[in-house]
Amino acid sequence: KIVAKVTDSINNKKVTKFGLIYGLLKYNGKKTGITSDHLKIGMEGQFVRSYNTTQKGIWKKTDNTTTYVETMTYGANSKEAYTAEYKARAYAVLEDGEIVYSNAIDYSVYEIAEQLYNNCMMPTIDGHKYLYNTILTKVTPEYTEKIYK
């Protein structure tokens, strides 16, 4: 899941659509060759996909900011999916057609799970155990179990 925010206007222009663009950087040890320059509307291809946010993806709305969530799946529950490396960025389409992009981030599900687990950042013990049992030990069977604090 990626959580992003967008304001109702950017550069004094109304935002008409917004969403996320995902790129697959590396899977099964193979680099795909994509860069942040490939993460643009109209550049979708084998390793790049863009998704407009729908009403179901809107998490909360304040006076002038919308927080939205998108969940991406790729080879669910496999070592390959957990260790694949991704790139993502948010975009907003303005009323005049201009598209504004955020900076891109790189991540892997495994790296995020490891960070959350090792720092006991999950809100529940069940979530903590899920990371260990479902992701961390699937990639690294000898992963050391950590007590939830």
Across the structure, where does each feature detected by a protein language model lie?
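Short, surface-exposed linear motifs at loops/turns and structural transition points
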Residues: 1-149
